[in-house]
Regions:
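A generic structural signal for short coil/turn motifs at secondary-structure boundaries
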Residues: 13-15, 93-95, 185
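Amphipathic alpha-helical segments that form well-ordered structural scaffolds
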Residues: 1, 83, 197-201
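A conserved helix-loop-beta module that forms one wall/lid of the active-site cleft
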Residues: 1-61
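Amphipathic coiled-coil/heptad-repeat helices and related helical stalk/stem segments
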Residues: 23-24, 68, 194
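ATP-dependent carboxylate activation and anion-phosphoryl transfer catalytic cores
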Residues: 96, 101, 111-118, 170-204
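Phosphate-binding site of ATP-dependent enzymes
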Residues: 33-35, 42-43, 48, 63-164
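A glycine-rich, aromatic-flanked flexible loop/lid motif
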Residues: 156-178
Length: 204
């Protein structure tokens, strides 16, 4: 993603893609320009602490709820050690299943250091958040009724399906997304490019 700001203890610190200073006006101007920012802890896990800031039609948004400029700036000051980046949307054909960004888990092996091999992968789609893309795309299945949706992914052609709802103490087969009711089967449109990216990361 593009990196805009790091929330330091004295205010936002501009990062490589910011074209503004780390001031109130600079931060708010960037938000107005790009429209959406993902906000997440600089060193976190399990999507804990994920938030979304937005600006649309002359209105500021915090987690898709209307706010004013003062509220947005207060939010920034109250979230030190967070990083503000480009906000991703689901794509590659997966947006028809759920608008919330998905996760592709990939394992590569590279025994020769020059020829990485895709060894295993699966897709994980967010559940329990409806269509609200400001919510974390993963909730650990530690409470009753909380699950993640995992899909088998064919490494050769990017086709996916054979869904499993993974709860803390059991697994349920599911061909439909539990929030949207849409069938969880298809093919990632840009699979060759996805594999090329994974290969590049493995060679880095």
């Amino acid at each position: 993603p593009k990196y805009y700001f790091y929330a330091g203890t004295c205010g936002p610190v501009p990062l490589m893609d910011a074209r503004a200073r780390g001031t109130r006006d600079g931060f708010l101007g960037t938000l107005r320009e790009v429209g959406e920012l993902a906000c997440k802890p600089c060193n976190g896990e399990h999507a804990v602490g994920f938030n979304k800031l937005g600006y649309e039609g002359g209105t500021y948004l915090i987690n898709n709820r209307e706010a004013d400029a003062d509220a947005v700036w207060r939010f920034v000051r109250e979230h030190p050690n967070d990083i503000y980046t480009e906000f991703f949307h689901a794509g590659g054909g997966l947006e028809r299943i759920s608008p919330v960004v998905h996760t592709l888990r990939v394992l590569t092996v590279n025994p020769t250091a020059t020829e990485p091999v895709l060894a295993a992968c699966y897709l994980r789609l967010a559940t329990g958040v409806g269509g609200d893309d400001s919510k974390p795309n993963y909730r650990p299945p530690e409470q009753a009724g909380v699950c993640s949706l995992n899909l088998r992914l064919d490494m050769d052609d990017g086709s996916f399906g054979d869904g499993r709802l993974v709860y803390g103490n059991h697994v349920v087969c599911s061909s439909l997304h539990p929030d949207t009711g849409v069938p969880c089967a298809g093919t990632i449109d840009c699979w060759p490019q996805v594999w090329e990216l994974c290969e590049g990361l493995a060679l880095y």
